[in-house]
Amino acid sequence: LLRYLKKIFYNSVAELRINKYKVIFLDIIWEKQYTMKICIITCHDVYNFGASLQAYALQHYLEELGHEVEIIDYRPGYLYKKYDWKSFTSKKFDKLNSFFVTRWMFRIAKWSYLRFSLGRKKCFDEFTKNYLKLTDKTYYTFEELKMNPPCADIIIAGSDQIWNPLFPNGKDPSYYIDFALSQTKRVSYAASFSVEYISDADKEFVKGMLAKMNRISVREYQGVDILKSLDIKNGVKVLDPVFLLDRNYWETFMHKGSEKDYILIYDFEGSDLMKRVALYFKRKKGWKIYSINDALPRLYADKNFTKVGPQDFLSLIYNCSMFLSNSFHGTAFAVYFNKPFYVFGLKGISLNSRMESLLRSVDLKDRFITENIDIEKLHLNYDFNKVNLLIEEEKNYSKQFLDSVLKTN
């Protein structure tokens, strides 16, 4: 009723400019009834394109619905100290850290690597400052969150690999919203386990954490299977937040690029197969090879991009003629922008469930290639009409999930 009345009065103001005070009165009621304080907890600032863009996408989508949204500025040491050249983040280096000489040898080696990333780090810091709305308070431990939790109507965990049991964040109660006040609704959106199963040793912890959640959605089909193995029947699969925003929005959001006719490489592991596929299509089509790198360049690439931020990342994918990667979000945007692409598996088969689930969602499972592939049989013939329809169906379902969460608060 309020939505209907508000629409009527807004139309009256636009056409007749009357009923001013009634509109203001209804606005007050509307804000009280429908505007909520929402906090998001995710790995938002780890100098990763996908992590930054998915955090922004969920924040912006919820803001467009009229809500007050903040990302909890949670910076646990296991995530953020690895960008500190003086810090040891792996227990296997504990013994080295106890000796002065080896400690400084490690620091020098780490600094030598990190200095190549400083330009990229600056781009990410600017993106975070300009686009991510963080809580005023920064939290460094779960205990700090528990002692002084942010006040919100709803706290949303996700998206991305926040529940990956192979990483420390997958065993951190913070990412299961275990710190929230009793009256705060706890919801996950497109959270990812990033694996096909979790070990028996982790099941009790994960099940106990998820039992406190009000609503659960995950990003992968395998995530739903994991939930079922934990006796959690009400979990659903939704799309990554980057799909919540329209293609047109991303086109205006990205930095403008003018380069054309290139194969874009985004490779985490130095894949020899990716290199061979890139060189094959370079010979076949006459395209150049561009590579996005964390630090060290790909020597076979015609051009390496090391000082790029999330908006440049989008532009490079949007303007490429072909995309090759083992990145989930790189693949997601290639699909969304209707770019010819191939996906390469990461070492450790369980880590590939993210890409496999995405490709299954859009009926492009044949784009995941392995070592035994015949490169000469690879092609660039794509019919994205069906893909786009499938994306719209899943997007609508994902939005309905969020709508149901917000309406039942």
Where on the chain are the PLM-derived regions?
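Extreme N-terminal basic, low-complexity initiation segments
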Residues: 2-10
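Short, Lys/Arg-enriched N-terminal segments with co-localized hydrophobic residues
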Residues: 5, 19-35
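Active-site anion-handling motifs in enzyme catalytic cores
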Residues: 30-409
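Short, intrinsically disordered, low-complexity terminal segments
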Residues: 10-11, 20
